[in-house]
Amino acid sequence: MASVAAARAVPVGSGLRGLQRTLPLVVILGATGTGKSTLALQLGQRLGGEIVSADSMQVYEGLDIITNKVSAQEQRICRHHMISFVDPLVTNYTVVDFRNRATALIEDIFARDKIPIVVGGTNYYIESLLWKVLVNTKPQEMGTEKVIDRKVELEKEDGLVLHKRLSQVDPEMAAKLHPHDKRKVARSLQVFEETGISHSEFLHRQHTEEGGGPLGGPLKFSNPCILWLHADQAVLDERLDKRVDDMLAAGLLEELRDFHRRYNQKNVSENSQDYQHGIFQSIGFKEFHEYLITEGKCTLETSNQLLKKGIEALKQVTKRYARKQNRWVKNRFLSRPGPIVPPVYGLEVSDVSKWEESVLEPALEIVQSFIQGHKPTATPIKMPYNEAENKRSYHLCDLCDRIIIGDREWAAHIKSKSHLNQLKKRRRLDSDAVNTIESQSVSPDHNKEPKEKGSPGQNDQELKCSV
C-alpha cells in the first residue's frame, strides 16, 4: 500500500497542466544543529507538505527545550506529526511502534495528495521508514504491547545469561552482539521466541528479497528524495555550544527541575533512576543529574561547580552526538550497498548568511525535479561501501578480559591506551618471571666444586637445562 500511495500520479499546477507527477517522500538528514527543522518548515510552506518528525525523544510529552521541539507557532505554520504524544513515564516505546504509526501517517498524507517531509536526528527511525529493516514478531493488528512487554521481561535478566541463550538458538546473531548490549540481545531472543525463526534468518530473507542488500530489505516507497545538510565540523561545534547557551537562556534549567520533580525524584530517592530507557535517555537530563539531586542540599559554591560541570558535559556530549549522526549517514546512506539505493543530495550549511542561495533554493529545485519526474541537475553524494569496515566480528581480548564486537572496534582497541598499558604490564611481569627463574636456578656458590653425588658433569648439565 505504501508504494502505491507514494507513486500516486496527480495533476500538477496550472503552469504544467496536462503533465503527470509522482509525489516524492522528502527526507531531510543531518546532524543536530544543521538546520533540518528550518528547512523542513520552509519546504512544507512552499510545497504545501506536512512534516513527520523522526526523533526518538520528541515523541514524548515534556522537555520541549532540551529535545529542541519546534514551537507551537511553527506547528501552526505547517502541520507536524509524531511530536509529544507518548506519556513521559512510558519506557518501552520502540522503533517498531514509531514505524507502524509513522508509515500510516505517510500513507494518509500521500492519499490527500500532499508531500510528506520526514525530518529528524534519529537516523535508524528514518531507516525504518525507507527500507524494510525491521522484523514483525506479531501481526500488526494485534498491537505491540504484549511483544514489547516480553522484551522488557528479558532485559531484566543477566546479560551474560541472555547472550548464552542466544548463542544456542542463533549463534550467528550472538557473534555480532556484545553480552552487555542487553537490549539487542533481548530483541533477538524475542524474535526467536515469538516466531520460532532466528533473527539472523529473518534478516537473511530480507537481504535476499528483490531490491534488498547487505544492510536490509528493499525500499518501502518508490520515490524518496533525500537531502543531507552538512557543515564544517569546527563551525558546527561552535554552533552547538551556542545552542546550549541559548537553551539555558530559554529556561532549560527550570524545565529540567520541573521534570525531575514530577517524574524522576521518587526514582532517585529509591536509587532506581533509569537513564537508558524512554525520555530519560535524552541528552541533557543525565548530564545535570548531580546538580539536580544536590540542589539546595550543598553549598552555593558546590552547586555552581556542579552546574558548570553539567553545562560543559552537555556541550561535549552534544558535539559527540553530532559526529555520531554524521558517521551513521555516511555508513548507512551515502555508502549503502544494494541494487536499488536512492541518491542523497548534499547541502552545505556552514554559512547561514547564504542559506537562501546555498540551501533553500537548491533544495526546492531538487524536490521540484522529483515532483516533475526529472533528474535533478545537482550531483548526488556517493561513498564506496567498505564491507570489511562494517563487519560485525567477535573478538576476545584475553589481555584486557574484554569482548570486542566489530573489526573497526577491534583495530581501535588494540591501539588504545588501556590495551597498550595492559601489554606493558604483561611484558614487565613476564620479564620479572624470567629474572626470578634465572636467580633461583643459579646457586650462590656456583663457583665451588659440586658436592652432590652423580656422574661427572651431571649437575652442570641440569643447570644448563634449567636456565
UniProtKB/Swiss-Prot annotation:
Gene3D superfamilies noted in UniProt: 1.10.20.140, Classic Zinc Finger, P-loop containing nucleotide triphosphate hydrolases
Descriptive protein name: tRNA dimethylallyltransferase
Function: Catalyzes the transfer of a dimethylallyl group onto the adenine at position 37 of both cytosolic and mitochondrial tRNAs, leading to the formation of N6-(dimethylallyl)adenosine (i6A37). Mediates modification of a limited subset of tRNAs: tRNA(Ser)(AGA), tRNA(Ser)(CGA), tRNA(Ser)(UGA), as well as partial modification of the selenocysteine tRNA(Ser)(UCA). TRIT1 is therefore required for selenoprotein expression.
Disease / disorder: Combined oxidative phosphorylation deficiency 35: An autosomal recessive disorder caused by defective mitochondrial metabolism and deficiencies of mitochondrial respiratory enzyme complexes. Clinical manifestations include global developmental delay, intellectual disability, microcephaly, and early-onset seizures.
Phosphoserine: residues bearing it: 443, 455
Organism: Homo sapiens
Transit peptide: 1-47
Chain segments carrying region Interaction with isopentenylpyrophosphate transferase: 233-255
Listed PANTHER family: TRNA DIMETHYLALLYLTRANSFERASE (PTHR11088:SF89)
Family named by the database record: Belongs to the IPP transferase family.
EC number assigned by the record: 2.5.1.75
Bias type Basic and acidic residues, positions: 445-454
